[in-house]
Regions:
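Receiver (REC) domain active-site loop signature in two-component systems and cognate sites
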Residues: 54
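Short alpha-helical segment
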Residues: 35-36
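Active-site beta3 strand of CheY-like receiver
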Residues: 44-49
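Two-component/phosphorelay signaling modules centered on CheY-like receiver
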Residues: 10-28, 96
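C-terminal output helix
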Residues: 105-115
Length: 120
C-alpha cells in the first residue's frame, strides 16, 4: 500500500514512516499542510495520515479542502493527534470528515488496527 504522512513534527513523521515501512508499505511525507494539498491531488494514496495541530493550517481546515475538491473528495484520511478526549476525536472524525483516528505516540498495534479498516 502507499501512504502519505502530513505532520509538522519530524520526530512523529519519522516514527510513523518507519513503522509503515517495516510493515512493507511505501511512504511519502510532507512537513506542512500548505505543501500537501498538491501532493494529495497528484498522488494515488491508499491512506493519508494527517496531523491535527500544525502551524500554518490545522488538519481540520486541510481536510475540508480535500473533501471539497472532487478528485480528492473520497481520499481515505486518518487524523493523528495526541488529543484523546472523546469530544475531540468525534469532532475530527464526524464533523471534519476524517475516516479514522490514530492516537500519538503511534505504535505497531494501533497502526495495524487502522490499516485493517481500510476498504479493499
Amino acid at each position: 500500500m502507499r501512504f502519505l504522512i502530513i505532520d509538522d513534527s519530524s520526530l512523529d513523521r519519522h516514527a510513523l514512516a518507519s513503522l509503515l515501512e517495516i510493515l512493507g508499505h511505501e511512504v511519502d511525507v510532507c512537513a506542512s499542510a500548505t505543501d500537501a494539498l498538491s501532493v494529495v491531488a497528484a498522488g494515488k494514496y491508499d491512506l493519508v495520515f494527517l496531523d491535527v495541530v500544525m502551524p500554518e493550517q490545522d488538519g481540520y481546515k486541510f481536510l475540508r479542502k480535500v473533501r471539497l475538491n472532487p478528485p480528492t473528495a473520497n481520499q481515505y484520511v486518518v487524523f493523528c493527534s495526541s488529543k484523546k478526549t472523546p469530544i475531540e476525536v468525534n469532532y475530527g472524525i464526524q464533523r471534519a470528515g476524517a475516516n479514522d483516528y490514530l492516537p500519538k505516540p503511534v505504535n505497531r498495534e494501533s497502526i495495524e488496527q487502522v490499516l485493517a479498516k481500510i476498504p479493499a
